[in-house]
Amino acid sequence: MTVHDVLHYLDLHVAPLSLKESWDNVGLLLGRGKKSVTKVLVALDATGAVCAEAKALGCDLVVTHHPVIFHPTGHVTDDPMTETVLDFLESGIAVISMHTNLDLALDGVNDVLAETLGLDHIMTLESDEDEALCHLIRTGFVKPCELPDFAAFVKDRLGCPGLRYASGGKPVREVAVGGGACAGYIEFVAESGADTFVTADLKYHDFQLAEKLGLNLIDAGHFETENPVIASLAARLGEQFPELEVRIAHHGDCIRYL
């Protein structure tokens, strides 16, 4: 079993690399493809703490959602911006990152988020006018309830230490979800007929816009809306490669709440 074998499976059966956005960086980002693999650690982020955990566990490979290398760099040193890359290289641990391709993929970030929130009749929100808006957002239905009650449910299901929400003046029935930073989809979601949008990384004026559009808006946190896919990804790797020991990283959200 090699790193390339794992990447081949992920590309063909989990999140095709061809789905990635043009600006993204995915696939095998660090290490040798021919490297033998016996232990894999799956994590949302490729941080120094994750590298240390992988090293302590004796892992040969780390599979992450967020890319270990995202912005172009002209050096890899112990500078804070590249030290994590150096940590992985010095530890001999390969890194595969599945980012926007996993956001868009069937049973990826957003399908798992929708399922975690108990949505029924989950569908991909499509646009006849703008291809760039297609394939990411998922919609589904919940039992009708008031927004504060649904927000409390989201907080509990995702393990949020806190969340923010704004009312569009409607009860919750048809819910759209976009894991991570999806503020750019607010108008698209409102036009779709959904009454509620669960996403993350929202600004003050995003909430104002949603209120004007009559859309309930919930910011449940970047980590919290994307991390559910990690357990799913680990389970799929374990089922496909029973000879591998697949572990889930213990790292959590770096954001703290008072």
Indicate residue ranges for each PLM-predicted region.
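Hydrophobic structural segments
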Residues: 1-258
